[in-house]
From Swiss-Prot:
Substrate binds at residues 28-31, 81-84, 94-97, 121. Pfam families: Rib_5-P_isom_A. The gene is rpiA. One of its GO terms (cellular component) is cytosol. It catalyses: aldehydo-D-ribose 5-phosphate = D-ribulose 5-phosphate. Keywords: Isomerase. Belongs to the ribose 5-phosphate isomerase family. This is Ribose-5-phosphate isomerase A. GO terms for molecular function: ribose-5-phosphate isomerase activity. Its EC number is 5.3.1.6. One of its GO terms (biological process) is pentose-phosphate shunt, non-oxidative branch. The active site is at 103 (proton acceptor). Coiled coil: none annotated. CDD domains: RPI_A.
Length: 219
């Protein structure tokens, strides 16, 4: 199977967690896009969705799914999203698509985080994929200096402005042995909006696309 076929398989497999009559949290990226396609087949059974990016919102609306503002929603049963890396502790690096802040906010509200990914995203140690950090523009250089002190090589993601109007620093060269400590440290740097480490709030279920089918891992 191609990588895209594996992504499609896990996107559709996540439908089993969608309860009729609920509002579903929806992520961003190529794997989440397959889940949105699948969710379109249930649009008459669900109340709607909360979306983590403008791109996902457009796709949801194009399929006739109502998109709610998170402020109008009391709780979410599930949040379904992909990952750039996921380790054995269900901790993830996310933010390759620059939607990390909204993704993290929605994940924090959901009862259950379902990560959908192909097997290439599974790692023993996080950090080979550059760690995205969303930063207030005026703080870019100051934050970069602090990230160097933490052992990383920050690189400004040229030409990218987040849906929140901020910029992204991608931090290379990290071997993340204590993801929770690093998440807390980076989030504590003035000017950082959030870091794409999902360790304090990791995944509850991972659906991993493999050549042998979809593998389910439960925390």
């Amino acid at each position: 199977m191609t990588q895209d076929e594996l992504k499609k398989a896990v996107g559709w497999a996540a439908l089993q967690y969608v309860q009729p009559g609920t509002i579903v949290g929806v992520g961003t990226g190529s794997t989440a896009a397959h889940f949105i396609d699948a969710l379109g087949t249930m649009k008459g059974q669900i109340e709607g969705a909360v979306s983590s990016s403008d791109a996902s919102t457009e796709k949801l609306k194009s399929l006739g799914i109502t998109v709610f503002d998170l402020n109008s929603v009391d709780r979410l049963g599930i949040y379904v999203d992909g990952a750039d890396e996921i380790n054995g502790h269900m901790q993830m690096i996310k933010g390759g698509g620059a939607a990390l802040t909204r993704e993290k906010i929605i994940a924090s509200v959901a009862d259950k985080f379902i990560c959908i990914a192909d097997a290439s995203k599974q790692v023993d140690i996080l950090g080979k994929f550059p760690l995205p950090v969303e930063v207030i523009p005026m703080a870019r250089s100051a934050v970069a200096r602090q990230l160097v002190k933490l052992g990383g090589r920050p690189e400004y993601r040229q030409g990218v402005v987040t849906d929140n109007g901020n910029v992204i620093l991608d931090v290379h060269g990290l071997e993340i042995l204590d993801a929770i400590a690093l998440e807390n440290a980076i989030n504590g740097i003035p000017g950082v909006v959030t870091v794409g480490l999902f360790a304090n709030r990791g995944a509850d279920v991972a659906l991993i696309g493999t050549a042998d089918g979809v593998k389910t891992i439960v925390k």
